Amino acid sequence: MTKYEEITLKPLSSAIGAEIGNVDISEELPEKVVGEIRQALLEYLVVFFRDQDLSDPQHHRRFTKYFGDLFIHPNFNLGQSNPEMVYLTRKPGDTAAAGERWHADTTMMKNPPMGAILYALEVPYWGCLLYTSDAADE
């Protein structure tokens, strides 16, 4: 297991996922911190940052660009002012929601991006997110 000096890391299971702390991803990050986040992503496949504020699209873009070029999803061209970002909202009374059933966000692309960033503002009590991977050791 890698030693992290700038970030804190809490593994969430023996197979996948870790929570990263001691970093404000809305701020400009030193290369060493970005490197440790990249390493944690490679090691744990899915990483989580709690209590962050990416409500400013510029902050969200900057953080995303640490990991590569921004991806414009071909299935979510919603005419929004930030085509690199997909805003999914559900208001009281709405009966349909994107992503309610099993789906893959980007892995079906011929040249998929290295990952995706989800910034959840509010998750309903019944809401859950499942990440899967076929990279686990046997």
PLM feature segments, named:
Residues 2-129:
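Non-heme Fe(II)-dependent double-stranded beta-helix
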Residues 131-138:
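Conserved small/polar residues in nucleotide/adenosyl-binding loops
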